């Protein structure tokens, strides 16, 4: 792996800092604390540049909250950084480092990265199952236990050192990585391990969580060869192959690799025959010839459709959330559900109009501020 250097100056460059502030402000320009920064953006860009150049940046405490995430409603602990200076620093770092971190990432390593969402994993699985039925007789499925909260700082920093030779960039990553257990205090979770964990919900984390498993992705794919398929969505891994013996060896390979970082596989890992049951992954159920949605998700979606359809005024949050969930149905073989519970019940046109009107209001507010 060729190490990358001489990049820190690009991060604290005034123009990059100014663009980072604007990136961080997207979707929240009407907030008072954001308005204050945008009204004097040139001054704040200079201040941001100076604190990065002079190494005076110190992360602020996070706001910790729990959410039910995505269509699967998985309970997650989010650590939200302050807009100023933390989110602006994160964007300044990511604007320069994103293309560098993207290099070497396995093609079907998806999740948390723009352009590499669940759709890429879904299409990859469907394509392989349909085109290569003989090579997809068996399936290996697993995920990592509490991945984000268990990421070891020492191994993550060592991996970054193998990728980056600029000591100042490594310093900034170190500040962000070390800040999480110290500043994301949550009474519900208890004291955090000071040597482990990165926060869900901040921009650098989405790259770091994928970057740490980059070697594992290539190691598995090399072991499986061309006659198998592999995809990883953040910490969930699915692999297919013509025989289960080799997939059991993949489990051993993954366990050994993760064990070096004191990470563990969840106990519900499995190797099974595709003809006996579908692949339950990303909220979908993948069969050899079709893709459906998990029943629990359809039940929640049914309730949501009924609730929103009865509203006199639909909020932006409800409109965007429901449009996203309806997209799941569109991307699956769920014709019966569409006909019975969506068609003539909820208007996508109405939902899109809510989103469009809100965006017009936001653009008008931005023009007035300018």
Where are these regions (language model features)?
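Conserved polymerase palm-domain catalytic core
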Residues: 51, 128-234, 238-255, 273
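Active-site-proximal segment of RNA-dependent polymerases
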Residues: 3-8, 94-152
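Amphipathic alpha-helical blocks
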Residues: 37-61
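Conserved pre-motif C helix in the palm subdomain of viral-like polymerases
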Residues: 74-106, 194-222
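Non-catalytic, polymerase-adjacent accessory regions of viral genome-replication enzymes
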Residues: 1-46, 362, 366-370
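Right-hand nucleic-acid polymerase module
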Residues: 87, 91, 186-195, 248-255, ...
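Short Gly/Ser/Thr- and Asp/Glu-enriched loop/turn motifs at secondary-structure junctions
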Residues: 60-62, 231-235, 268
């Amino acid at each position: 792996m060729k190490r990358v250097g001489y990049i820190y100056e690009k991060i604290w460059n005034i123009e990059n800092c100014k663009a980072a502030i604007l990136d961080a402000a997207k979707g929240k320009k009407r907030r008072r604390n954001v308005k204050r920064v945008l009204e004097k953006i040139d001054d704040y860009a200079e201040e941001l540049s100076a604190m990065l150049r002079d190494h005076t940046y110190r992360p602020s405490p996070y706001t910790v909250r729990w959410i039910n995430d995505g269509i699967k409603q998985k309970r997650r602990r989010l650590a939200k950084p302050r807009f100023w200076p933390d989110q602006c620093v994160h964007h300044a770092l990511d604007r320069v480092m994103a293309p560098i971190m993207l290099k070497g990432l396995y093609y079907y390593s998806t999740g948390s990265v723009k352009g590499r969402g669940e759709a890429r994993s879904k299409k990859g699985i469907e394509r392989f199952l349909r085109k290569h039925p003989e090579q997809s007789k068996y399936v290996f499925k697993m995920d990592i236990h509490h991945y984000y909260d268990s990421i070891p700082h020492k191994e993550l920093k060592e991996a970054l050192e193998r990728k980056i030779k600029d000591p100042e960039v490594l310093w900034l990553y170190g500040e962000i990585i070390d800040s999480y257990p110290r500043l994301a205090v949550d009474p519900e979770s208890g004291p955090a391990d000071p040597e482990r964990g990165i926060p869900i919900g901040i921009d650098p984390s989405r790259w770091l969580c994928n970057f740490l498993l980059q070697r594992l992705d290539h190691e598995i794919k090399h072991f499986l060869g061309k006659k198998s398929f592999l995809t990883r969505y953040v910490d969930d891994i699915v692999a297919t192959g013509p025989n289960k013996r080799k997939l059991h060896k993949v489990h051993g390979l993954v366990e050994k690799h993760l064990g070096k970082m004191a990470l563990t596989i969840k106990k519900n890992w499995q190797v099974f025959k595709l003809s006996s049951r579908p692949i339950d992954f990303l909220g979908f159920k993948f069969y050899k010839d079709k893709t459906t949605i998990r029943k629990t998700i359809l039940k929640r979606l049914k309730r949501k459709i009924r609730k929103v359809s009865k509203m006199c005024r639909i909020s932006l949050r409800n409109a965007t959330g429901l449009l996203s969930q309806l997209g799941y149905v569109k991307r699956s073989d769920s014709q019966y559900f569409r006909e019975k519970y969506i068609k003539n019940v909820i208007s996508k046109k109405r939902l899109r109009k809510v989103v469009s009107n809100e965006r017009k209001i936001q653009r008008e507010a931005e023009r007035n501020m300018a």
